A protein has these predicted regions:
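His/Asp/Glu-rich metal-coordinating catalytic cores
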Residues: 1-99
Length: 99
């Protein structure tokens, strides 16, 4: 699972080492939820120095966790648009176990 950029970078490396075609890629898109067993994962666009970055809202039977490597709030980013504060706010209003 990865964003378009992430999948592309990994595919290039696999080709470089003769491993292309041995891995299944699933491209994720912000706000498009993914069901994995008892978990629902929603990628959320975040502004970052690396393009195409996302955080993850992970819904489980115990509650919701927001996972992100790091984040910044930049209202005037040069590329990729600002962090999706509306979606993060929605999760905050519902309640989050951990960030």
């Amino acid at each position: 699972y990865g964003t378009r950029l992430t999948c592309g970078l990994i595919k290039n490396k696999l080709e470089e080492f003769g491993l292309a075609g041995k891995t299944k890629f699933v491209e994720i898109v912000p706000r498009q939820k993914i069901k994995l067993g008892c978990f629902t994962v929603e990628p959320i666009h975040v502004n970052h120095s690396i393009p195409d970055a996302v955080a993850f809202a992970i819904d489980s039977p115990a509650g919701t966790i927001i996972q992100t490597g790091d984040f910044k709030i930049d209202y005037t980013p040069l590329a990729c648009g600002p962090t999706d504060l509306a979606t993060l706010s929605e999760y905050g209003q519902k309640g989050v176990l951990a960030l």
